[in-house]
Curated annotation (Swiss-Prot):
Location in the cell: Cytoplasm
Free-text function comment from the UniProt entry: Specifically methylates the uridine in position 2552 of 23S rRNA at the 2'-O position of the ribose in the fully assembled 50S ribosomal subunit.
Biological source species: Polynucleobacter asymbioticus (strain DSM 18221 / CIP 109841 / QLW-P1DMWA-1) (Polynucleobacter necessarius subsp. asymbioticus)
Active site per database record: K177 (proton acceptor)
Protein name (record): Ribosomal RNA large subunit methyltransferase E
Length: 224
């Protein structure tokens, strides 16, 4: 009975959520797009000419936003074809994702050799395979057990950080989703070891009752 009440409560929240309605109206696949857009507006993450990797991209709203943002920036560059993005977007997920124009999608696991090789084959040779921005909205399937869910989220954060450390340009940035709970402080410390600047963000589109928080790292520290 409690589960049914929870499901009904979630459905009611979902149906009345202004961000859900806005996403439907604007053609985005998920309300999560507004979390990224708010952080981008605050921190100016997305710039013309960037190569951006979207980890755990399905259903695709973050890739949609990046594509639209780079296309808007491309309007001021006469070398960019009309309606095309000024930059490169690579998305990867173990789940399928419907095509998005100008987004290179790989269905695979970047932790495994085959998936990583497919992703790296798309990286710009001119930049020695390095990228400007890595995004991760990855989240585990929730069990409802707080400690277990936090541990799974911490694992996803660490693998995103490992990927970014290996593939970012020195001035690059990483934005990931976390849970502000058990293990969060350790993730922050891991970020501080890698990035010169670390900040947390709780966008308005992130539900107040959710422990969800976003962690942003900018500018890699030189390797020791």
């Amino acid at each position: 009975m409690a589960k049914n009440k929870f499901n009904k409560s979630w459905l009611q929240d979902h149906l009345t959520d202004p961000y859900v309605k806005m996403a439907q109206k604007e053609g985005y696949r998920a309300r999560a797009v507004y979390k990224l857009s708010e952080i981008d507006e605050q921190d100016h993450l997305i710039k013309a000419g960037m190569t951006i990797v979207d980890l755990g991209s399905a259903p695709g709203s973050w890739s949609q936003y990046v594509r639209n943002r780079l296309t808007e920036l491309g309007k001021s560059n006469p070398k960019i074809e009309s309606g095309k993005p000024d930059g490169q977007i690579i998305a990867i997920d173990i789940l399928p994702m419907e095509d998005i124009a100008d987004v290179s999608f790989i269905q695979g696991d970047f932790r495994e050799e085959e998936g990583l090789a497919a992703l790296e084959a798309l990286l710009p040779k001119s930049a020695e395979g390095k990228v400007d921005l890595v995004l991760s909205d990855m989240a585990p399937n929730l069990s409802g057990v707080g400690v277990a869910d936090s541990a799974r989220m911490a694992f996803l954060a660490e693998i995103a950080l490992d990927f970014a450390t290996a593939h970012l340009k020195p001035e690059g940035a990483l934005l990931i989703k976390c849970f502000n709970g058990s293990g969060y402080s350790q993730i922050v410390e891991s970020f501080k070891k890698v990035f010169k600047t670390v900040a947390s963000r709780k966008p308005k589109a992130s539900r107040a009752k959710s422990s969800e928080i976003f962690l942003l790292g900018k500018n890699l520290k030189p390797p020791k």
